[in-house]
Protein backbone atom coordinates (compact mmCIF):
# COMPACT_ATOMS: atom_id res chain seq x y z
CA UNK A 1 0.00 0.00 0.00
CA UNK A 2 1.27 3.48 -0.88
CA UNK A 3 1.16 5.87 2.07
CA UNK A 4 1.44 9.61 1.70
CA UNK A 5 4.56 11.21 3.17
CA UNK A 6 4.68 14.96 3.95
CA UNK A 7 7.62 15.42 1.56
CA UNK A 8 5.92 13.73 -1.41
CA UNK A 9 4.78 17.09 -2.77
CA UNK A 10 8.12 18.86 -2.42
CA UNK A 11 9.41 18.01 -5.91
CA UNK A 12 6.81 20.38 -7.30
CA UNK A 13 7.66 23.30 -5.03
CA UNK A 14 11.42 22.77 -4.74
CA UNK A 15 12.19 24.32 -8.14
CA UNK A 16 10.32 27.48 -7.14
CA UNK A 17 11.57 27.81 -3.56
CA UNK A 18 15.22 27.57 -4.63
CA UNK A 19 14.83 30.72 -6.71
CA UNK A 20 14.53 32.58 -3.39
CA UNK A 21 16.16 30.38 -0.75
CA UNK A 22 18.05 27.18 -0.06
CA UNK A 23 15.87 24.12 0.48
CA UNK A 24 16.65 20.80 2.16
CA UNK A 25 14.71 18.16 4.05
CA UNK A 26 16.21 17.02 7.34
CA UNK A 27 15.53 13.67 8.96
CA UNK A 28 16.99 11.53 11.75
CA UNK A 29 17.93 8.81 9.25
CA UNK A 30 21.52 8.17 8.23
CA UNK A 31 22.42 9.43 4.71
CA UNK A 32 22.39 5.94 3.15
CA UNK A 33 18.86 5.32 4.44
CA UNK A 34 17.77 8.78 3.28
CA UNK A 35 19.13 8.14 -0.20
CA UNK A 36 17.35 4.80 -0.51
CA UNK A 37 14.06 6.22 0.78
CA UNK A 38 14.27 9.34 -1.41
CA UNK A 39 14.95 7.21 -4.49
CA UNK A 40 12.00 4.93 -3.66
CA UNK A 41 9.74 8.01 -3.54
CA UNK A 42 11.24 9.77 -6.57
CA UNK A 43 12.37 12.77 -4.53
CA UNK A 44 14.77 15.16 -6.31
CA UNK A 45 15.44 17.70 -3.53
CA UNK A 46 18.46 17.62 -1.19
CA UNK A 47 18.29 15.88 2.16
CA UNK A 48 20.45 16.28 5.26
CA UNK A 49 20.72 14.03 8.29
CA UNK A 50 20.46 15.25 11.86
CA UNK A 51 21.25 11.76 13.19
CA UNK A 52 23.22 11.91 16.42
CA UNK A 53 22.53 15.61 16.94
CA UNK A 54 20.08 17.68 18.97
CA UNK A 55 18.95 19.68 15.92
CA UNK A 56 15.34 18.40 15.85
CA UNK A 57 14.92 18.88 19.60
CA UNK A 58 16.54 22.32 19.44
CA UNK A 59 14.06 23.31 16.73
CA UNK A 60 11.07 21.97 18.71
CA UNK A 61 10.38 19.02 16.41
CA UNK A 62 10.53 16.32 19.11
CA UNK A 63 7.46 15.66 21.27
CA UNK A 64 7.52 15.38 25.05
CA UNK A 65 7.26 11.61 24.54
CA UNK A 66 10.33 11.62 22.27
CA UNK A 67 8.53 11.18 18.93
CA UNK A 68 9.43 13.12 15.81
CA UNK A 69 7.13 16.03 14.92
CA UNK A 70 7.17 17.28 11.32
CA UNK A 71 7.54 20.97 10.60
CA UNK A 72 9.37 23.62 8.64
CA UNK A 73 11.85 26.31 9.66
CA UNK A 74 13.22 29.26 7.72
CA UNK A 75 16.72 30.49 8.47
CA UNK A 76 18.64 33.61 7.50
CA UNK A 77 22.37 34.23 7.60
CA UNK A 78 23.41 37.45 9.31
CA UNK A 79 27.16 37.89 9.31
CA UNK A 80 28.64 34.83 11.03
CA UNK A 81 25.29 33.82 12.55
CA UNK A 82 22.38 31.79 11.26
CA UNK A 83 19.03 32.84 12.71
CA UNK A 84 15.71 31.05 12.57
CA UNK A 85 13.25 33.68 11.41
CA UNK A 86 10.06 31.60 11.20
CA UNK A 87 8.76 28.10 11.76
CA UNK A 88 5.58 26.08 11.97
CA UNK A 89 4.63 22.51 12.70
CA UNK A 90 2.67 20.33 10.32
CA UNK A 91 -0.78 19.13 11.34
CA UNK A 92 -3.77 17.43 9.71
CA UNK A 93 -5.58 19.72 7.31
CA UNK A 94 -2.78 22.27 6.97
CA UNK A 95 -1.70 23.62 3.60
CA UNK A 96 1.55 21.62 3.58
CA UNK A 97 -0.26 18.36 2.70
CA UNK A 98 -2.12 19.68 -0.31
CA UNK A 99 -3.21 16.30 -1.68
CA UNK A 100 -5.88 16.02 0.99
CA UNK A 101 -7.38 19.34 -0.12
CA UNK A 102 -7.64 18.07 -3.70
CA UNK A 103 -9.29 14.86 -2.49
CA UNK A 104 -11.74 16.94 -0.43
CA UNK A 105 -12.92 18.57 -3.68
CA UNK A 106 -13.77 15.22 -5.29
CA UNK A 107 -17.23 13.67 -5.03
CA UNK A 108 -17.00 11.47 -1.94
CA UNK A 109 -13.94 13.29 -0.62
CA UNK A 110 -11.01 11.08 0.33
CA UNK A 111 -13.30 8.07 0.02
CA UNK A 112 -11.63 4.67 -0.02
CA UNK A 113 -8.21 5.89 -1.12
CA UNK A 114 -5.66 3.45 0.37
CA UNK A 115 -3.88 6.18 2.33
CA UNK A 116 -7.11 7.29 4.03
CA UNK A 117 -6.50 5.33 7.23
CA UNK A 118 -3.15 7.08 7.52
CA UNK A 119 -4.42 10.59 6.76
CA UNK A 120 -3.43 12.04 10.16
CA UNK A 121 0.07 10.59 9.78
CA UNK A 122 0.64 12.77 6.75
CA UNK A 123 1.21 15.83 8.78
CA UNK A 124 0.55 15.08 12.42
CA UNK A 125 2.84 14.80 15.37
CA UNK A 126 3.72 11.28 16.38
Tell me what each language-model feature is:
Residues 1-20, 35-40, 46, 54-126:
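Non-globular targeting/processing and membrane-anchoring segments
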Amino acid sequence: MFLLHPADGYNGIHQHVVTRAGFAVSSPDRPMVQTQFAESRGWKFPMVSHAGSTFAADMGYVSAQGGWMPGVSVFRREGDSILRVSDTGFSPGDDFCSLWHFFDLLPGGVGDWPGRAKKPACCSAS
